[in-house]
Every structure is written in C-alpha cells, then in structure tokens.
C-alpha cells in the first residue's frame, strides 16, 4: 500500500491528535489535587511521535509551547535503546534532563503498538512544592539550583510496567505538601495512560507505514504554513530593549535586548546583549528561552498553523551561554517565569515594528505569583496564586481587562476555592479606575487583590513585575500604570514590598497582603478617543470624571441618571490641549 497521505486524511489525523492532547489536559485538570493545576491551569500536555517530536499540544499554557521539544530530544538521546513498553519517565531538572525549572515535573510514557515504539504521551505540571528554601519553591533569592528543591534527572517511575516505589517515597519526603504533589503526579500519570490508549486506537485504524508518513507530513505541513506566514513579514531587523526592575530592596535594572531578523521565510531571534546570568532564581534555562521565543512568534502567525514541532523549523533562537536566557549550571531558575514573560514582551515590542496592525501595546506582564505558606491546625498549607492583569490597547480595540498574559492562558484561583481550602480570606478583588494606559484605544485596567491571613503565621514570597518600567504604549498611546505590593495597607505599619522579593516576608494572623498589577499601555493619541467610549468607561467606573478630563480631554458632569458629556467644553479643552502640545 502506498504511504502517500491525502490532505483530507492528514487533517483528520491532525485533528485527532489535537483532540487526544486536549483530552489529556482535561484529565489532568479534573483529577489533580492542587489549585495551581486544577484552577490556575499551570500545566501542559502533548502527543509526540516515535521520534519524540510534538504532534499536538493541549490548549493550556503557551509558554510551555515547545517545552517537550528539548526534553524529548534529550530523553531519546540518553535513553534510546533502554526505552521499553510499560515505562514511565519522571524528571524536572533543567540542566540534567532539559526541563524548565524544578517545580515543573514531567511525566512521559512511551506508546508501544504490536511491540514497536510509535509515540509518546507527555505531560508537565507545576507542582505546589518541590522542597527548597521557601514554601512553593519559587524563591527569588536562591543563588543556585541546589537551594530550589528536589532535582530529578531522567528516572523511570515505572520500568517495564514495574513501579519504582522508592521514587514516590523520595518525592513525598522532600516536599511540604506530599498529598498535593503526589496527587498531581498521579493525575499526570492517569492522563498518559489515557493518551496511550487513545493513540493506540487511532494507530489501529491506519496501515503502519502510512501512519508514520502522516506524522512526518504533519510536521512538514506546519513548517510550510509557518514559512508562508513568515514570508509575508517585511524583511529586516527590528530591535527592542526592556528591563526587569531588579532584585530586592535595592534593585538594579536587568536589561533584555532582542534583535528580530526576518529574511525570506526564516526568522532569527537573537538575545545577544541581554543581561548576564544573575545570582537569583530568575534565570531562564535555554529550553524555556526557546519556548518563550517560539510562543511569541507563533502568536502573530495564523491560528490555522498546527502546534506541531515542524512550525519551529524556520525559527532560530540565539541565546548566548552565561546570560540570563541561557545560564550555566548551577544557576538558580525556580522563578524563571518572569523572564519568560519579559522575553515574550520584548519580542512583541520588536514585532510591533514589523507588524503594527497585529501587535497591541504592552500589557501588565506575566502573572504576579504570590505564595503564602505555613501551618494551620497542625497541617501544612501552600497557597500559590496567579494574579492576572491586562493587555495593551491595539489598532482596532481597547486592551482586554483581567486576562492572562499572552504566554500564560491561565486563570486565577476562584475566591470560593481559596477560602474553602486555605486559611486565607480574600478582602478585595477588582479593577483600579483610571489605571488603563490612555490612548485612542485604552489599555486594560489594573487588577487589585487583597489576602488576609487567618493562620497564626506564614511566609510570603512575591514574584511581580513592571513597577519602575511600566507597560509602554504604541502609536502615541501612553504607558500603563505600574505594579505595587503592600503588606498591611492603610495601617501605620504598612510596608511596600520590592517588585521581586528576595527574602521571605513573615506574616502573622490578620496581616493583609495587597497587590496591584500593572495595567495595559494605550494605543494612539488619547485625544483621538471617541468621547462616547470615554462616557461608557465613566458609566462602568473604569474612568473617573477627573481622569476623563486629565487623560482624554473629555468634559463630563454628574447627572441623576449618570454622567453626561459636555460636548462644547470637550471640544474646547481638546483644542487647547492639542495647542499646548504643539
């Protein structure tokens, strides 16, 4: 029988792989034990071919896009002939196993059909804890990976179907909340078992040679589509520079520099000039740097391109060794998420120059990650939250409010779940008026949240961003507002915390932690914003009467039925403001 596969058959098979990958994602969500996986959706799933190449990835975390590429390449290069039916691999180490950071545990299972290796079911999930010097294992202040928790090189959790009970024991002994961690790993294992079953069922419907040829063609097809899209981007080199605020109480800006070069149907992402690696937990191992770079490029290409590994072939990532985007062991990397988000934001800044109609102004940055851990009623608890922010305004519309960063696609933990599961009360959750970056199209609003501790004591760590360097606007739009973290706001003992907290903060019963995320930058001249849109923002409480006048030159007055525009005064004020601006 010919190995040739029709376009129709290829699309059916590709869709089947995507369905299986999404089914794995649903299984992990529905069977996991921790809120960081179940509610915040900090995990990913994928189906790979026999060579470990990603055929489809579940619709969860874009920053994990490609996270299986390096891991599977390393696994097959080092394990190769030792891979056997019934095996399950577990690993997390970025230096020994091409992982991303220690909290992200990979569970992968080879799929054998009729005695031959035909594919892989793969999962990665952020664990609530993996040991180390702070609860939640997201220490900014770590100076080397040995301080960050349990390192798992490539290990067989199951060897030919035989369970390695010692690994479970080691894992349980090294984490603060073993019930959560082991439960989530078992959820990943369950997903892989289902992936194996569904893949085998799909394989049985095909002639083996044609199935393998179709897998190759899925990669080739993704590559062709990506190249066609890249070819439509103007040739040239676009540069962008930005900074993370810095570390601790005396922060020094940490620069990120990217040169995005388009030549024909290929792209080079060059991070030369970016900060050297730092003695802190925000270094990005190169597999994560690759994933962040691919995800940014992928976001401006057609959604019809499959998330198969072939789409990465036209993209070359240059990450100089010894930098924050390619650290040398044993550099710490537990809180590397902020660096991934900043890399994506830098790339979007470069892409905005090449594709101004596709890229919005800068957003709030990655999710703020506060972690509160301690003991309550004799039991340990670790609360990890992903506070989501806003997108910048774009050429066509205002920025989105209260959504995940482009690279996250995650969610906050619902208030009801927090208060039911943890000794924490959510005191405040809402938008901050007048915070969105002014523009013809306004940036999304900042979000504020307050958490009150109900346990006797706990420790707090915070990973946030964009206070000193707030989100930039585009096309004449103004910057968004910066972030803020405060312990016990509005009290005589109020304490403003650093953007990146390097030393755990002690909390006592009744203490309140307040965080305000950065907002989105604006797009276009604020004086060109439709006054009717400003009026709608006034009615919804997104903008105040004072803010409308100050930021948009719109004059409104309060009335019994809500604010009303003063058209004549608005016209006069805008004329005066434009004249003053020259």
Name each model-derived stretch:
Residues 1-85, 90-113, 117-582:
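Glycine/proline-enriched, intrinsically flexible loops and inter-domain linkers
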């Amino acid at each position: 029988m010919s190995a040739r596969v029709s376009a129709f058959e290829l699309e059916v098979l590709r869709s089947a792989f995507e369905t299986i990958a999404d089914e794995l994602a649903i299984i992990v969500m529905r069977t996991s034990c921790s809120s960081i996986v179940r509610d915040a959706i900090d995990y990913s799933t994928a189906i790979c071919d026999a060579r470990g190449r990603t055929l489809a990835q579940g619709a969860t975390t874009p920053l994990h896009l490609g996270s299986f590429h390096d891991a599977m390449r390393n696994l097959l290069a080092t394990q190769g002939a030792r891979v056997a039916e019934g095996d399950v691999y577990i690993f997390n180490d970025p230096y020994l196993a091409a992982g991303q950071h220690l909290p992200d545990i990979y569970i992968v299972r080879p799929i054998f059909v009729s005695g031959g290796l035909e594919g892989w079911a793969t999962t990665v999930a952020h664990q609530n804890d993996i040991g180390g010097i702070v609860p939640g294992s997201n220490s900014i202040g770590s100076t080397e990976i040995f301080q960050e928790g349990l390192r798992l090189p490539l290990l067989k959790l199951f060897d030919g179907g035989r369970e390695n009970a010692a690994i479970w024991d080691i894992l349980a002994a090294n984490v603060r909340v073993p019930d959560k961690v082991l439960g989530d790993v078992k959820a990943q294992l369950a997903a892989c078992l289902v992936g194996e079953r569904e893949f085998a069922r799909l394989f049985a419907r095909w002639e083996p040679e044609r199935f393998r040829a179709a897998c190759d063609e899925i990669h080739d097809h993704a590559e062709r589509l990506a190249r066609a899209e890249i070819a439509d981007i103007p040739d040239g080199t676009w540069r962008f520079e930005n900074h993370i605020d810095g570390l601790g109480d005396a922060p020094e800006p940490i620069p990120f520099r990217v040169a995005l070069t388009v030549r024909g149907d290929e792209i080079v992402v060059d991070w030369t000039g970016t900060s050297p690696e730092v003695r802190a937990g925000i270094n990005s191992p190169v597999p994560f740097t690759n994933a962040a770079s691919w995800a940014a490029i992928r976001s401006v290409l057609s959604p019809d391109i499959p998330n198969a590994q072939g789409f990465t072939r036209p993209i070359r990532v240059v990450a100089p060794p010894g930098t924050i985007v390619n650290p040398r062991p044993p550099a710490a990397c537990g809180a590397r998420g902020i660096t991934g988000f900043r890399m994506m934001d830098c790339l979007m800044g470069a892409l905005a120059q090449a594709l101004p109609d596709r890229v919005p102004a800068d957003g709030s940055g990655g999710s703020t990650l506060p972690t509160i851990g301690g003991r309550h009623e004799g039991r340990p608890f670790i609360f990890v939250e992903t506070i989501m922010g806003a997108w910048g305004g774009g050429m066509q519309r205002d920025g989105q409010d209260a959504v995940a960063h482009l690279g996250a696609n995650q969610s906050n933990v619902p208030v009801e779940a927090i208060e039911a599961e943890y000794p924490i009360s959510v005191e405040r959750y809402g938008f901050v008026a007048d915070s969105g970056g002014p523009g013809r199209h306004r940036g999304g609003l900042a979000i504020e949240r307050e958490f009150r501790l109900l346990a006797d004591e706990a420790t707090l760590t915070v990973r946030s961003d964009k206070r000193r360097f707030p989100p930039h606007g585009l096309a004449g739009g103004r910057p968004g507002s910066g972030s803020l973290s405060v312990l016990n706001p509005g009290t005589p003992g109020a304490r403003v915390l650093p953007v990146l907290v390097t030393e755990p903060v002690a909390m006592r019963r009744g203490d309140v932690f307040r965080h305000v995320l950065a907002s989105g930058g604006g797009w276009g001249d604020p004086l060109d914003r439709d006054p009717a849109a400003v009026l709608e923002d006034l009615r919804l409480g997104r903008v105040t009467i004072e803010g409308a006048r100050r930021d948009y030159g719109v004059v409104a007055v309060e009335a019994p039925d809500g604010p009303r525009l003063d058209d004549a005064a608005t016209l006069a004020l805008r004329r005066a403001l434009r004249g003053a601006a020259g």
